[in-house]
Amino acid sequence: MRRRGPEKEEEACGVWLDAAALKRRKTQTQLIKSSTKMLTLLPGERKAKISFTQRSCPSAGTRQTSIASFLTSQQGKTNGADQRSVSSHTESQTNKESKEDATQLEHLTQGLRADFMAPPLATSTPADIQEARLSPQSLKASCQHGIGTPYLTVPCLFRPDTSVCAGASKASLACSFAHDLESSCLLDQKEGEDSSCEREWLQGSKKNNYQSVERHSKTTGHKGHQLLDKTNLENVSAKRSRQAPVLQTYKDSRRGANMKAVKQSSCPIPGFSWDSERNDKDSWSQLFTEDSQGQRVIAHNSRAPFRDVTNDQNQGYGRVPNSLWAQCQDRTTQFNLQPDSLFTQDSEGNQVIRHQA
């Protein structure tokens, strides 16, 4: 037997956790990154380097119904949140960029005030505007109507100091909304007029074709009927008088042939008969009977009387119904065999098959 050595001491844990240090809250050292998606800008514009913070719950009492209301309600709020999170260096840069962009926008608005062709932006949300501007179809449509007007609202979201943007964006939004309503109404009117014109043209063409066919048939048929009425009537009456006896004999011959074919091909159709039902009842009565308790059981008709059977092995083999016994007798007579040579009785009186040694 080996001696057990001294038990090893438990290794001390080298990591000690300070509960007081864990309870302290970590101070935020990094700036919060902007979670709002920036809208697409013009190629000449610069992207603002301002990080916006997303508010968890909207301010009470304000409901966004259009882009203009969104701009006016969010101008003062974004200024306070941005000035707290952005350093003084970034503020100076953004002020310079905002002034440059304001001068550029003034030139753009002066040249594009006459063209108020813009896509519908009055009833859409910023996410819808972003999706619409990112799609190539909307870009094509905006380029065709006028470059610059749909993008006038973009710097207003990120540079609220410029007062020109708000006025220009409101005017462009109102005009674009009115113009879109007018264009939609005009399109509906044009579609209705086109559909009505097509229907009228189809109806007119059908009527013209029908009238031309009627005129042609009247002009050609009227003259022909006047000339050929008498001759046609005489020819038709003569043909009918000639064909009448031939058709009558043909019909009589067809009727006789059909009757003969039906008589020859008529075979007994299996149908319901009361005799068959009676035969079925008789066969069922031969196969089944009632016991002392009135229950329906299989009838065992054997030569020997019923006895108390103790040998269960020979119980199912000896008793054969009369119908089956008759069939067996017929088969044995066909093969010139006697029934006594096939079956015998055991000590208990049951009919069993004879086994010759």
UniProtKB/Swiss-Prot annotation:
Record's signal peptide: none
GO molecular function, one term: damaged DNA binding
Disulfide pairings: none
One Gene Ontology term from the biological process aspect of the record: double-strand break repair via homologous recombination
The organism's place on the tree of life at top rank: Eukaryota
Keyword Methyltransferase: no
Similarity section: Belongs to the AUNIP family.
Assembly information from the UniProt record: Interacts (via C-terminus) with AURKA (via C-terminus). Interacts (via N-terminus) with NIN; this interaction blocks NIN phosphorylation by both AURKA and GSK3B. Identified in a complex with NIN and AURKA. Interacts with RBBP8/CtIP.
Protein name in UniProt: Aurora kinase A- and ninein-interacting protein
Organism: Bos taurus (Bovine)
Gene name per UniProt: AUNIP
